[in-house]
């Protein structure tokens, strides 16, 4: 199948990838846009992984206050250079993440930040729920691990599904931005406040 300039342009607009990357992905996918996007995402994630070790000393503090004035978020989003911190793409990513935090109430940025005593308490609760199930101990441990994964997905920002698109996690969104912008990006911390909490 012949890849037209219009097809390349459309794919670039949808993904933010480079022109030759788009053309090659379309050729590899025989003109199938969804396949081409998947190919680019896989390559983009590889690019993001290469940039993950770089230091992020620049960035922005992004604020979001819900329209009713009862929920507010402060988010520290870091990148490598001040130039990137001033771009619309970076600011838009920060705003999306801050709105997500307001809506979904994560407690930690990553699973590594969850205190050990909280994890033990959760495991204890799950064991108590399953003690009369009659299942073997190793099966119960597997179930507990599965429940713990769900706990992380509910409470850790990077593992949560994005509030406005359940097909991607916050981590996926950040990796897509890294692939598009070309710099490492990290959420350092956030504070979510709500009247009465």
Swiss-Prot record:
Transmembrane segments annotated in the record for this chain: none
GO MF entry, a single one: translation elongation factor activity
Gene3D superfamilies the record matches: 1.10.286.20, DNA helicase RuvA subunit, C-terminal domain (1.10.8.10), Elongation factor Ts, dimerisation domain (3.30.479.20)
Domain of life: Bacteria
HAMAP family membership: EF_Ts
Family that this chain belongs to: Belongs to the EF-Ts family.
Protein name: Elongation factor Ts
Source organism: Fervidobacterium nodosum (strain ATCC 35602 / DSM 5306 / Rt17-B1)
Gene: tsf
């Amino acid at each position: 199948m012949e890849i037209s300039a219009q097809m390349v342009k459309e794919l670039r607009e949808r993904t933010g990838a480079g022109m030759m990357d788009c053309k090659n992905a379309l050729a590899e996918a025989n003109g199938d846009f969804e396949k081409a996007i998947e190919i680019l995402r896989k390559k983009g994630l590889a690019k993001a992984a290469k940039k993950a070790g770089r230091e992020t000393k620049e960035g922005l503090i992004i604020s979001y206050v819900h329209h009713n004035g009862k929920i507010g978020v402060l988010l520290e989003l870091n990148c490598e250079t001040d130039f990137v911190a001033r771009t619309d793409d970076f600011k838009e990513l920060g705003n999306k993440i801050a709105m997500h935090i307001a809506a979904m109430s994560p407690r930690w940025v990553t699973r590594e930040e969850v205190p050990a005593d909280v994890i033990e308490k959760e495991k204890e609760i799950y064991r108590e729920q399953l003690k009369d199930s009659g299942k073997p101990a190793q099966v119960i441990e597997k179930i507990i691990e599965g429940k713990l994964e769900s706990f992380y997905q509910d409470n850790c920002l990077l593992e949560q599904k994005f509030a406005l698109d359940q097909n991607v996690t916050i981590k996926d969104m950040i990796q897509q931005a890294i692939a598009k912008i070309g710099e490492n990006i990290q959420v350092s911390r956030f504070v979510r406040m709500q009247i009465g909490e």
